[in-house]
Design a protein with these regions (language model features):
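Terminus-proximal functional modules
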Residues: 1-98
Length: 98
């Protein structure tokens, strides 16, 4: 039986609102190391699953209007090749292969 704990991990990180670009870089680096971001929970716990290392860019987007019109907002990103992951602290998290 496969050890599922080895295929999942959590990391604690703190990024401020001003650090959104550093956060994107952190998620991209982890994906390149074979850890795909699956979600963020309070307080700053990042969840990952093992994956094939791949160059994937992450986008954190803060848009109050997007939150008000969620379906159209997410569809706009999906039409441009982005995968929606989640919302957290006002930001929407997206990713796509480079």
């Amino acid at each position: 039986m496969k050890d599922r704990k080895k295929d999942r991990k959590r990391e604690y990180r703190v990024f401020t609102i001003a650090d959104w670009e550093r956060e994107q870089d952190y998620l991209r680096k982890r994906h390149g190391e074979g850890w795909k971001f699956t979600g963020l929970t309070y307080p700053g716990v990042y969840h990952f699953v093992r994956c094939q290392p791949e160059d994937v860019v992450y986008q954190l987007d803060y848009n109050e209007e997007g939150i008000k019109h969620k379906d159209e907002y997410v569809r706009m990103f999906q039409d441009c090749g982005w995968e929606y992951i989640q919302d957290y602290a006002g930001y929407s998290y997206f990713r796509k292969p480079v």
